[in-house]
């Protein structure tokens, strides 16, 4: 039996690629459900349907298409599936197919499994029947409802073997076999028992409909998109259960939550005393499931961009959004208290973070280059800088010309919005291709000549380590909540959000000219264009350390992600490419060996994450109710009256 879209029998169904356009399909004589026609002509190839070659139905023209004829051939779906939405290339404006898997309802899973078992049994009992005999022309009167199957002996082994093809969005919970049995008993409209007077979970069942060619999108269960498995905001009260919409709610019902609180509050000009807790509640992680150790991490699904063939949009992963961020993780048996740890996906290097892009952004397979069709959108790297001397380059592959394509490049903090350009607010510093202006808080200021297509901009970032941090531990918390999203494990963490005070800095006001705002003394961003020094664009960068960053649950601490991220933003087809090193196009000779390529941060961050996991494991094993976080931190001595030039220019 053919379990998915690959051609296991060495028989090609492909023919003339112009075989069945919508206009030709509409001229054929179709049956009522639009699954069979008298001419036996389907798909791009114009060939007949065949029970041993899975196909799917276009939701627009309603023609049927072989999985092996798609571009590229689809190998991720079981034959006779019904939980999908497909649009053929003849019915899309850009000529690219659209395919999306939906929610896997047990009623549909069971029917799909049973249909495949029918074909499998027929092949086993008739091994000498040629493949062509399975064509719709010869199998229209095939009685699939005469084949009976048992739950334990037939359905359970088949579903177990083909779980990822049948229901990739589902976890294999302990009760799934009982759910399968209940589904068979309850759905008389779809399954019939061999003896209806003894209908129970141990009965033999067959499909009610004898025609396997009726299987199509929505046939068993209406198509429903797979939604996020987590709420937009988590509750943090100690006795409040998690939101009912959480897919993991059953794992939390009996979990005790442990508090990690401070005794000494922080003080800051922008934060009132005792207003912002420095350490959040610790949630006990949900228990492992057997399937957690069998799940193979997957990359995002890449969909080609019609206007830029080398760029792709991403799907099948959660994207960072205001107040929440995501990273792939796995169950860790060697960490029985921490229980879950973050993992890396290829390419294993400094690159654009799959999750940390605005959804309209298109990226290439190297994950170093990005573009967008409309509006300014941002993409952030998966590495960030906290202290030290760093250098990276950005190549402008398209921008700064008269065609409307533009880029803005620079660095940003976690709070900076992804649906805005670099330099939009107080959380990012950017350079504008048009006019070569530097931009902070959306206020452009003259800095250098324009740059555009072919230019390479080098950025030297200096973030001196504050003297007070050498003998003081900043508030930190590494706790993360695992969630399940489309069959994969991810950490969900409250991300840092803009404060009201920082947002108000964007409004021109004489009162904002001088403000009590912490910064990093001696920090700067120096700029090079094609290896030539352009000057220092920014000095005394705003401090990102607690309490200057507060997450969406109103806590002020470092979760291991605070720092400045290399960032690119594109507009109207602009294209920018990161060059993180160690090999650069125009590394200035004046930079000493102490200025490191940003590529070195990748392995450093992994080591930092592993170290935090080990320390947390030791800490929680000794006493799960004790926090290892040190809170008593003096106020940064250099945080005080800061003259913000962007505001000074407006008010004078």
Curated annotation (Swiss-Prot):
Cross-referenced InterPro entries: ASH2, ASH2-like_PHD, ASH2L-like_WH, B30.2/SPRY, B30.2/SPRY_sf, ConA-like_dom_sf, SPRY_dom, Zinc_finger_PHD-type_CS
UniProt feature, compositional bias: Basic and acidic residues: 247-261
Region (Disordered): 1-32, 234-270
Biased composition (Polar residues): 15-32
Subcellular location: Nucleus
Keyword Zinc-finger (UniProt): yes
Residues that, per the record, bind Zn(2+) 1: 43, 45, 66, 69
One GO molecular-function entry: zinc ion binding
Protein family per UniProt: Belongs to the cclA family.
Protein name: Set1 complex component ash2
Gene: ash2
């Amino acid at each position: 039996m053919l379990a998915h879209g690959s051609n296991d029998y060495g028989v090609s169904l492909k023919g003339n690629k112009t075989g069945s356009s919508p206009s030709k399909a509409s001229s054929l004589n179709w049956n009522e459900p639009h699954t069979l026609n008298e001419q036996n002509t389907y798909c791009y190839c114009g060939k007949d349907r065949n029970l041993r070659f899975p196909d799917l139905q276009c939701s627009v023209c309603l023609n049927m298409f072989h999985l092996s004829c798609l571009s590229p051939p689809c190998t991720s779906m079981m034959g006779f599936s019904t939980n999908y939405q497909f649009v053929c290339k003849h019915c899309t404006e850009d000529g690219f197919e659209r395919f999306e898997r939906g929610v896997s309802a047990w009623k549909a899973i069971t029917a799909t499994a049973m249909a495949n078992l029918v074909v499998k049994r027929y092949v086993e009992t008739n091994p000498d029947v040629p493949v062509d005999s399975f064509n719709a022309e010869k199998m229209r009167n095939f009685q699939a409802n005469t084949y009976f199957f048992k739950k334990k002996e037939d359905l359970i082994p088949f579903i177990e073997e083909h779980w990822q093809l049948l229901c990739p969005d589902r976890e294999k919970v302990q009760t799934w076999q009982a759910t399968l049995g209940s589904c068979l008993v309850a759905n008389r409209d779809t399954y019939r028992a061999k003896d209806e007077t003894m209908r129970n979970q141990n009965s033999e069942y067959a499909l009610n409909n004898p025609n396997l060619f009726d299987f199509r999108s929505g046939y068993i269960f209406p198509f429903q998109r797979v939604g996020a498995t987590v709420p937009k905001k988590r509750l943090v009260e100690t006795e409040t259960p998690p939101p009912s919409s959480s897919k993991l709610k059953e794992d939390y019902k009996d979990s005790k939550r442990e508090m990690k609180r401070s005794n000494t509050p922080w003080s800051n000009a922008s934060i009132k005393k005792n207003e912002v807790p420095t350490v959040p509640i610790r949630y006990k992680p949900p228990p492992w499931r057997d399937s957690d150790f069998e799940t193979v991490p997957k990359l995002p699904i890449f969909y080609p961009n019609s206007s830029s063939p080398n760029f792709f949009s991403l799907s099948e992963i959660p994207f960072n959004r205001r107040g929440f961020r995501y990273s792939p993780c796995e169950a860790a048996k060697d960490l029985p208290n921490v229980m879950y740890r973050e993992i890396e996906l290829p390419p294993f290097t400094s690159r654009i973070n799959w999750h940390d892009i605005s959804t309209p952004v298109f990226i290439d397979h190297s994950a170093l280059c990005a573009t967008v069709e409309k509006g300014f959108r941002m993409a952030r790297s998966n590495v960030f800088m906290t202290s030290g001397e760093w250098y990276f380059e950005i190549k402008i592959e398209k921008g700064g010309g008269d065609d409307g394509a533009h880029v803005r490049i620079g660095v940003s903090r976690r709070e900076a919005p992804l649906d805005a350009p670099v330099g939009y607010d107080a959380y990012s510093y950017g350079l504008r291709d048009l006019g070569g202006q530097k931009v902070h808080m959306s206020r452009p200021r003259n800095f250098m000549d324009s740059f555009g297509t072919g230019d390479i901009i080098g950025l030297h970032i200096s973030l001196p380590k504050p003297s007070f941090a050498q003998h003081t531990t900043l508030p930190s918390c590494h706790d993360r909540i695992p969630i399940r999203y489309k069959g994969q494990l991810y950490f969900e963490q409250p991300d840092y959000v803009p404060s009201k005070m920082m947002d108000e800095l964007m409004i021109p006001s004489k009162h904002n000219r001088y403000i009590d705002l912490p910064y990093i003394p001696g920090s700067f961003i120096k700029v090079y264009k094609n290896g030539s020094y352009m000057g220092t664009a920014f000095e005394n960068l705003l401090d990102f350390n607690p309490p200057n960053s507060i997450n969406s649950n109103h806590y002020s601490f470092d979760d291991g992600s605070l720092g400045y991220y290399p960032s690119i933003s594109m507009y109207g087809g602009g294209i920018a490419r990161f060059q993180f090193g160690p090999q650069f196009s125009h590394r200035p000779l004046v930079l000493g060996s102490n200025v490191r390529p940003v590529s070195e941060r990748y392995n450093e961050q992994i080591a930092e994450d592993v170290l935090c996991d080990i320390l947390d494991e030791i800490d929680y094993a000794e006493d799960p109710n004790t926090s290892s976080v040190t809170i008593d931190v003096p106020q940064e001595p250099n945080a005080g009256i800061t003259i913000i030039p962007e505001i000074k220019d407006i008010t004078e």
